[in-house]
Amino acid sequence: MSYVSEQLELLKKKNPGEPEFIQAATEVLTSLEPVIQANPQYEAAGILERIVEPERQIMFRVPWVDDNGKVQVNRGYRVQFNSAIGPYKGGLRLHPSVNLGIIKFLGFEQIFNCLLYT
């Protein structure tokens, strides 16, 4: 089994119920496979393990009062992947349909967005 395949299997085991994140990571790691295979030093340095694991995951409650005066409580999420090149990019998502897998997917994609513009 290749290094990329091993990491994808591990990712699926560690993140069950997060299909959006798994799909994004699978697409990126699969596209990187030729480069990873041609450069064994990346495996030795554990590059893929570090790319797919967030530095921080913050989950918090957001209480608010609706138009009828009733208190509602939503979950908020912030996932931060890599601070190596400076502050984290991203934001907060507070919509009730959002879950941790979606936020991890968005944060994961921001790694590469930041690298392109740095």
What are these regions (language model features)?
Residues M1-K13:
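Charged, compositionally biased N-terminal leader segments and the immediate start
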Residues E9, P16-L29:
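Ordered core of a single globular domain
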Residues K12-P16, T30-Q41, D67, F108-N113:
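Generic secondary-structure signature for well-ordered alpha-helical cores
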Residues Q41-Q72:
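Structured beta-strand/loop patches that form or line metal/cofactor-binding pockets in enzymes
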Residues V73-Y77:
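Beta-strand scaffold of nucleotide-dependent catalytic cores
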Residues R78-E109:
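Extended active-site and interfacial segments that coordinate phosphate-rich ligands
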Residues Y117-T118:
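Conserved small/polar residues in nucleotide/adenosyl-binding loops
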